[in-house]
Regions:
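Electrostatic, structured charged patches in enzyme active sites and in nucleic-acid/phosphate-binding
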Residues: 1-161
Length: 161
């Protein structure tokens, strides 16, 4: 990235840990956009092996979800994970290292255009106190739940690298 002159992106990589990686999880090679996605995939594979979920997949959509007639971004959305629960229910999980306004816009559009889809928001960590509380409150309107990944990763310990 430095060669291309994206200094701001370089800073984001340092602060947020958004380093793409290629890793094997569940016997398959995956191209993750960030370390958070890699760790979450390990957690989902752990749940699958423990028979807590039926299956999971990453960036498995042949094309993005389009928001027809929308002129202002976002006009399309590609979710991170698809989790199939043991009863066959499919849940879309969106992972975010930092919860921002555009994330809520995507969630709101998904709820409007694809109301049959179940969404969950997975945050790298949920700050204590009021920081980001309004964004989380808004996101709760469009998601089944918001998950704090840092709590899960602490509980998993050495099982997730």
């Amino acid at each position: 990235m430095e060669r291309m002159g994206f200094e701001q992106d370089k800073r984001v990589v340092k602060v947020m840990g958004n380093r793409p990686c290629i890793e094997f999880v569940g016997g398959k090679e995956w191209h993750f956009d960030s370390q958070l996605e890699y760790k979450w995939a390990q957690y989902l594979e752990f749940l699958k092996q423990a028979e807590k979920i039926r299956d999971w997949d990453f960036h498995c959509w042949p094309e993005p979800f389009y928001f027809i007639g929308v002129k202002k971004a976002p006009v399309q959305y590609t979710p991170d994970f698809l989790v199939t629960e043991n009863d066959g229910t499919e849940v879309i999980q969106e992972l975010k290292g930092h919860h921002d306004g555009p994330t809520n816009s995507k969630l709101a559009r998904m709820a409007e255009y694809y109301p049959d889809k179940i969404m969950e928001l997975v945050l790298q960590s949920i700050p204590k106190g009021s920081k980001g509380a309004n964004r989380r409150h808004t996101a709760k309107k469009y998601t089944r739940r918001i998950i704090d990944a840092s709590v899960i990763f602490r509980q998993m310990g050495a099982l997730i690298k």
